[in-house]
Amino acid sequence: MSKMMVFTGNANPDLARRVVRQLHIPLGDVSVGKFSDGEISTEINENVRGKDVFIIQPTCAPTNDNLMELVVMADAFRRSSASRITAVIPYFGYARQDRRPRSARVAISAKVVADMLTVVGIDRVLTVDLHADQIQGFFDIPVDNIYGSPVLVDDIEDQRFENLMIVSPDIGGVVRARAVAKSLGVDLGIIDKRREKANHSEVMHIIGDVEGRTCILVDDMVDTAGTLCHAAKALKEHGAAKVYAYCTHPVLSGRAIENIEKSVLDELVVTNTVPLSAAAQACDRIRQLDIAPVVAEAVRRISNEESISAMFR
């Protein structure tokens, strides 16, 4: 523990402060700003030679600025002789561009970012609820992907919901939703979205009986909130008594807050992997949980060369 040092950029300093409080160590001193032309500038204000350095920096909006802060900081620590550099990226931006669809001339941006982080000398990466698990394979360095589900499950249990059912908002999220349902010992529902004909709106098929149930939609992130709001509407139309949504990453871009406020969703519960905007904080239907204890425990285990997977057994 004596060699561990934790630093942060400007992406989510509040989370970093919460993590170091859990670890009972001070937050490292680094200055991260911009030159007059907008270039990122960074300077480490204390000795890091031989230290086990952790940089807490989600690559949320402004995505490119936060990514460049992480890259430039990592280079500064490498040139300052840190013994090991771990990038703690609670929310990994560019994760949605992880494949090249057939006949599409697009970049695989997740791979580009993985290469950038590796080439600047980062030794390992710690993420929370990667959008696609296969992104770990884009790196040539160790990647530990931990889960936000324990925090979400604990809160669900504390709420003492009656007649509870976990629902996946789409087919792609079934594995995640099934794991939460299994942890809670409750039923699983699935929403199957399909477009019956071209130029026709999507039809939502509900797999499972939601009549009179308290339904909880589970997903890794909420972006514009369109999927969750449409899912909540479909569930209510099929007789659900209450509909809540639990998501790890509150990206909440575009008209997300407006969509949530106009929806029939009773509450959206998120973690603090991404800081909430002022509008999100003012929305009485959004509640934020603290994921710092989970991140701090993972950091401690990495520093002490202990098992990460043992956290989730």
Swiss-Prot record:
User: HAMAP family, per this entry?
Assistant: RibP_PPkinase_B
- Enzyme class per UniProt: transferase
Q: Name one GO molecular function term.
A: ribose phosphate diphosphokinase activity
Name the UniProt record assigns to this protein: Ribose-phosphate pyrophosphokinase
Q: Where in the cell is it found?
A: Cytoplasm
Cofactor stoichiometry and binding remark: Binds 2 Mg(2+) ions per subunit.
**What Gene Ontology cellular-component terms does the record carry?**
cytoplasm; ribose phosphate diphosphokinase complex
Q: What's in the keyword line of the UniProt record?
A: ATP-binding, Cytoplasm, Kinase, Magnesium, Metal-binding, Nucleotide biosynthesis, Nucleotide-binding, Transferase
Alphabetical list of PROSITE patterns matching this protein: PRPP_SYNTHASE (PS00114)
Principal location listed in the UniProt entry: cytoplasm
GO BP term (any one): ribonucleoside monophosphate biosynthetic process
Q: Where, in this chain's numbering, is Mg(2+) 1 bound?
A: 131
Q: What cofactors does this protein use?
A: Mg(2+)
Q: What does this protein do?
A: Involved in the biosynthesis of the central metabolite phospho-alpha-D-ribosyl-1-pyrophosphate (PRPP) via the transfer of pyrophosphoryl group from ATP to 1-hydroxyl of ribose-5-phosphate (Rib-5-P).
SMART domains, sorted: Pribosyltran_N
The record lists D-ribose 5-phosphate as bound by: 195, 219, 223-227
The catalysed reaction is: D-ribose 5-phosphate + ATP = 5-phospho-alpha-D-ribose 1-diphosphate + AMP + H(+)
* Pathway the protein contributes to: Metabolic intermediate biosynthesis; 5-phospho-alpha-D-ribose 1-diphosphate biosynthesis; 5-phospho-alpha-D-ribose 1-diphosphate from D-ribose 5-phosphate (route I): step 1/1
Q: Extract the SUPFAM superfamilies matched here.
A: PRTase-like
Q: Which Gene3D superfamilies match?
A: 3.40.50.2020
Q: Which gene encodes it?
A: prs
Q: Which family does it belong to?
A: Belongs to the ribose-phosphate pyrophosphokinase family. Class I subfamily.
Q: Which positions in this protein are listed as binding Mg(2+) 2?
A: 170
Entry binding sites for ATP = 37-39, 96-97
